[in-house]
Design a protein with these regions (language model features):
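Short, conserved acidic/polar surface loops in the N-terminal third of protein domains
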Residues: 44-48, 68-71, 107-109, 123-125
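Catalytic micro-motifs at enzyme active sites that drive phosphoryl/nucleotidyl and oxygen chemistry
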Residues: 45-47, 82-86, 96-102
Length: 184
């Protein structure tokens, strides 16, 4: 994928490594599902047509989030400068680091857990995911949503906010894949 800047390549590798860390952990893999633009681009649209800079997760079951947040902090301990923000319906971990490739710039990673929407319509699936480069090699199965359900959340997002990326994501997915409109 032709990213515009070296730090975007670094951030994309950090996202991939974080996903492997999260979903290689049996506890977290049973508690969290991966969704959002990053899920759509990493799992269903290849090559990635757009840069995505965060990890959106959903708490699978309605239960206290404290132990999940604690474990998430443990498995992401390779990332520096963690700030945790807890709200009623979502919990966020923010990480800040400097890029390794000059010129040095700030890279941030946001990992957000939606603690409100515990349902899914089409059932969760596990999709193999791997990273293989000189910086990090690892693999896991990501717990996520089926393509049509991810597209449904993108369609809903069009009604809730005005961000061109949602329309772009829908366009790319609909032109690259056969989808069932009734499921969306």
């Amino acid at each position: 994928v032709p990213w515009n800047a070296n730090e975007q390549v670094e951030q994309d590798l950090i996202i991939s490594r974080a996903l492997v860390a999260i979903f290689s952990d049996d506890f977290l893999a049973s508690k969290l599902a991966f969704r959002g633009g990053t899920a759509l681009h990493k799992l269903y649209l290849s090559p990635q047509p757009r840069y995505s800079e965060d990890i959106d997760l959903v708490q699978i079951d309605a239960e206290p989030i404290k132990s999940t947040m604690y474990r998430l902090g443990e498995v992401l301990n390779f990332l520096p400068d963690r700030v945790t923000k807890q709200k009623r319906f979502n919990n966020t971990m923010l990480f800040r680091m400097e890029s390794e490739i000059p010129p040095t710039v700030q890279i941030r990673l946001k990992v957000e857990i939606n603690c409100f929407e515990h349902f899914n319509e089409l059932g969760l699936v596990k999709i193999p995911f791997s990273v293989d480069n000189s910086w990090f090699t690892g693999q896991c199965e990501l717990t996520t949503y089926r393509l049509n359900e991810l597209l449904g959340t993108k369609l809903r997002a069009l009604y809730q906010r005005k961000k061109g990326r949602d329309l772009f994501d829908l366009y790319k997915a609909l032109t690259l894949h056969e989808v069932n409109p009734d499921e969306i």
